[in-house]
Amino acid sequence: MSNENQAIGDQVTEYVTVMIGGQLFGLPISRVQDVFMPDRVTRVPLSAPEIAGVLNLRGRIVTAIDMRRRLGLPPRTDDKPSMAVGIELKGESYGLLIDTVGEVMKLGEDTREPNPVNLDARLARVSAGVHRLDGQLMVILDVDYVLNTAAEPMAA
């Protein structure tokens, strides 16, 4: 193995795992500011459908993004409370509303793969690659893409 390949094999990324609509996602831990249960979300009139609203998190105004809507998935049918992952982009705070938060996983960059050709197009749009875990595919969430496209105003 060359030195360059050895360096890639030694690189490890930590991911916060989350479930959205039965799909496992990994968010690079370096991007995650908070994990919290959203309290009151105030709807914002005329906002994009995936913008659930805004909330107050320890004195900060946070834009809440409904990841199920963002991915084109049906709304939850259970009564379990949503969780949120706090992310920051360009000085703005966002809360990605998700179903559940899992564990933190350390995964080697050498096991990261490009999107499989049969990956659902809704997932492929927001994916920065995948890791194959024991019988499950973890989609690496491209946080910048999700936030940049959610923040863009809709064309009139």
Predicted segments with their positions:
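An acidic, low-aromatic, low-complexity terminal/linker signal
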Residues: 1-156
